[in-house]
Design a protein with these regions (language model features):
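Bacterial N-terminal signal peptides that target proteins for export
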Residues: 1-8
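N-terminal signal peptide c-region/cleavage motif recognized by signal peptidases
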Residues: 16-18
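Active-site-adjacent structural segments surrounding the nucleophilic cysteine of cysteine proteases
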Residues: 21-71, 313, 328, 332, ...
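Active-site nucleophilic cysteine motif
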Residues: 30, 34, 38-41, 55, ...
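Sec/Tat-exported extracytoplasmic proteins
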Residues: 77-84, 131, 159, 266, ...
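...with weaker cross-activation on analogous glycine-rich loops/strands in unrelated enzymes
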Residues: 117-183
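Short peripheral tails and domain-boundary helices/loops at the edges of structured domains
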Residues: 176-198
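Low-complexity, Gly/Ser/Thr/Pro-rich intrinsically disordered linker/tail segments
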Residues: 196-364
Length: 421
């Protein structure tokens, strides 16, 4: 009889713990001393544990959790909190000014019928389904000192592309900072969600000055720790409004050059600079080719009807094209200021050819070998050709356009009559 009672009690305890299970039970606090958990988070983001295939690799416990830009940031913070037995908190929309604020947290018992791994996955999906870029900017992050930017911090973008009326919003995670003061960034997009693709990882990114932060909800920010929701924001570690003051005083001009100087440990050589610019431009156009191809396939899927606002926003390329144009401008300034030599088989030679007004057949062959952008079975461009097309305003960012118009092949009748957003 005693054995039956003990067995019954054990079953009851087991059932009770399952019935009232939190997503996970934290054993630590972010503000624990002497452990610096924020510093550990920064090192974790910089490590190989955070990578492009976090949500696509077969052996990942988080496989098939596809994230756009803000989703990725929330997912990162949840994963680190769970794996290190820390609490997680994010404000529930619409409760910021309520008498009783509500939060998404690991204490939720919504998924107590699931095992722990499944609870964590469900929690991530629930949070990213309900929160986005604006919410992250206004509620779950705060602006920081420019000199204190670290791995794991966020760069938030809000701007109106040239010729457009609708604002573009985006956020990226700083994965690491190079010795020359440029950022490696990792991020998701709506396209990574729709296409179930890997995250983007861009190395040594230098942002263009039109993305300089003018208002409090843009720029370089840090995710709030759970206890910080109850604190005065101005008292938070590294809190600062300096980036907005600097941007407004100088109208954004030279902002990112200033940020780079704060974090630079050494100067790059002329050849290193030439390699960085040439490689970045080549990769940017090749990435654009993949993105345009994805939009064209989506057009086929929807039988070539006009895309609605959401679809248009997902598949258009105004921000991408603007960033490439700014990169071209920076590369040209680099060539004029640093004056790279023409040594054969060097990146310096390639940069000179890229901006030469008198290139011949030999130079064309050299640039084609170094970087060819294949946009379809029928069309390919070398880097000089596609650079000139973009600067001439012939590349279309409209995802409803046919491939010939997307890439500046002069057939104006191919331009869509669908509305632009």
């Amino acid at each position: 009889m005693d054995r039956i009672k003990k067995l019954s009690l054990s079953i009851l305890i087991l059932l009770s713990s399952s019935l009232f299970a939190q997503v996970w039970t934290p054993l630590h606090k972010w503000q624990d001393s002497p452990i610096e958990w924020e510093e550990k988070f920064q090192k974790w983001v910089e490590s190989e544990q955070v990578h492009r295939e976090m949500f696509t690799k077969e052996d990942s416990p988080y496989k098939d959790i596809y994230t756009d830009c803000a989703d990725f940031i929330y997912a990162l913070r949840i994963i680190f909190s769970y794996e290190n037995s820390l609490p997680f908190k994010a404000l529930v929309p619409g409760t910021k000014y309520s008498k009783i604020k509500k939060y998404y947290s690991q204490s939720s018992k919504r998924w107590n019928h699931l095992d722990e791994t499944s609870r964590v996955r469900s929690f991530i999906l629930h949070v990213i389904d309900n929160l986005g870029t604006d919410h992250l900017a206004h509620n779950d992050s705060y602006p920081i000192k420019l000199a204190d930017i670290k791995s794991g911090d966020i760069f938030m973008i809000k701007f109106t592309p040239e010729g457009k009326e609708t604002q573009t919003k985006h956020s990226q995670v700083i994965k690491s900072i190079s010795e020359i003061g440029l950022f490696d960034v990792i991020y998701g997009t709506r396209n990574t969600v729709l296409e179930k693709k890997n995250l983007y990882h861009v190395k040594q990114r230098k942002f263009s000055d039109n993305l300089a932060p003018f208002i409090n909800h843009q720029g370089f920010k840090r995710f709030k720790q759970p206890w910080q929701y109850e604190a005065t924001v101005t008292d938070l570690p590294s809190y600062s409004q300096e980036q907005y003051k600097r941007t407004n005083e100088h109208q954004g001009e030279g902002f990112f050059k200033y940020v780079q100087a704060l974090h630079k440990k050494k100067d790059e050589t002329v050849e290193q600079g030439a390699k960085r610019f040439f490689t970045s431009l080549c990769e940017s156009f090749q990435e654009r080719a993949k993105f345009v191809d994805s939009a064209l396939k989506y057009l086929e899927k929807i039988n070539h009807r006009c895309m609605n606002y959401s679809e248009y926003d997902t598949h258009s390329t105004p921000m991408r094209d603007g960033q490439i144009k700014a990169l071209i401008s920076d590369a040209q300034i680099f060539k004029e200021v640093r004056q790279p030599n023409n040594e054969e088989n060097s990146y310096s030679q390639l940069i000179n050819i890229l901006f030469s007004e008198n290139s011949g057949a030999l130079e064309k062959e050299t640039i084609q070998k170094a970087c060819l952008i294949k946009v379809s079975e029928n069309y390919s461009f070398d880097l000089v050709e596609v650079k000139d097309l973009l600067l001439s305003g012939l590349l279309s960012s409209n995802p409803n356009d046919k491939i010939e118009y997307r890439w500046g092949i002069k057939n104006s009748h191919l331009k869509t009559k669908c509305p632009e957003f």
